Amino acid sequence: GVFFTARYFVPFLRTGKPGRAASAPGKFAVISSQMGSSTRSGTSAPIYRASKAAATNLARSLALELAPDGIAVGAYHPGWVQTDMGGAEAAITVEESAEGLLQRFAALGPATSGVFETYQGEEMPF
């Protein structure tokens, strides 16, 4: 998913789009999970963990590749969210997660490109 999305959209970020100059900085966000972090080992959901580790590391690689083009790439953990997957016991609401992620996207730039952050802006280890 992340790879094919990037493969499709990166050319548009590099060349600009109607109404945006090609020199305007582009941004690309990857939603991952702390369960893909190397510090969160465990035996549950190994395929999910592997897919999130891959997504996070792809974001880091894209950040390095796209930096010369002025495109920032961020990887984000949305939190443990009250969804069908997270359940009613999860720590935060969808709205809280979305609000935090929108703040992270707005702040995404060269200084935070290639960084894995929580929806609250805390840096996470890969």
List where the protein language model places each region.
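Catalytic loop of short-chain dehydrogenase/reductase
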Residues: G1-F4, V10-P68
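Ser/Thr-centric signal marking residues that sit
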Residues: T5, S51, T83, S113
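Active-site micro-motifs of SAM-dependent methyltransferase domains
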Residues: P11, G36-S37, W80-T83, G87
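PG/GG-rich flexible active-site loop of Rossmann-like NAD(P)H-dependent oxidoreductases
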Residues: S33-M35, A45, A75-Q82, E123
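Conserved short-loop catalytic and cofactor-binding motifs
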Residues: T43-P46, M85, E89
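Conserved Rossmann-fold SDR core element
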Residues: T56, A63-Y76, V81, A111-F116
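C-terminal helical subdomain
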Residues: A75-P78, G87-F126
